[in-house]
Amino acid sequence: VSNIKALIPGELQKVWELVLNTENYAAWRSDLSKTEAISDKQFIEYTKNGYPTTFTVTLVKPYRRWEFDMENSNMTGHWTGIFTAKGDETEIDFTEQVKAKKWLLKPFVKSYLRKQQTQFVADIMKNFS
């Protein structure tokens, strides 16, 4: 399990809309080459190297909570994002639970998740600085 919290200098509605607009991820996420919408509940992210991860949305509570399951050839997991208005800023609280499919990868999961989460938050921040 990996968790990251941050205070984004932007209004809740704008932060929410940025994060949930998965089709536009490639425009601002430094770790992705593209995203592909499969349906209104499923999308695929492709890394810069073209490696796909499939996401299936499991819960949407507008402007409060977004959850999805994720899977690729190396892992399965669940992501929870909680969004809270703090005046004209937004607190984000993102938690990822991931299981490596290959035992060789298990020792690296925690550090990989931390790196991914830190980059995701940094990319969000760039949109509001």
Predicted regions and their residues:
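Hydrophobic pocket/interface hotspot
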Residues: V15-V19, Y25, F43, V57, ...
